[in-house]
């Protein structure tokens, strides 16, 4: 499901069983990422599918990438695997919240 930034952030903050997933590359993640996010690179399809198969289906997953395209694809795959995944429309380039840099 696609959510705008306001709803994505609000729903994530109100959800006690949520995890933020960044589906960009390691290099992009190192340049800056949303606080408390974990990296699962969708550009590594085998590793991505293995990683999502190990995720807890009781949690909600708030997913983002640079502009929202890769995260949209990731959410589709995650939803097909029985996970509740929410795409950040516009991605990190439109994010107005805090960014953590490595």
Where are these regions (language model features)?
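Rhodanese-like catalytic fold shared by cysteine-dependent sulfurtransferases
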Residues: 1-18, 26-60, 66-102
């Amino acid at each position: 499901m696609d959510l705008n930034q306001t709803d994505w952030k609000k729903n994530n903050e109100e959800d006690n069983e949520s995890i933020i997933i960044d589906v960009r590359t390691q290099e992009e993640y190192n340049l800056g990422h949303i606080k408390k996010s974990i990296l699962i690179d969708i550009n590594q399809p085998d590793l991505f599918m293995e990683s999502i198969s190990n995720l807890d289906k009781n949690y909600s997953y708030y997913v983002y990438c640079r502009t929202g395209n890769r995260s949209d694809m990731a959410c589709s795959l995650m939803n097909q695997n029985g996970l509740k995944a929410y795409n950040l429309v516009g991605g990190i380039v439109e994010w107005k919240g805090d960014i953590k840099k490595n």
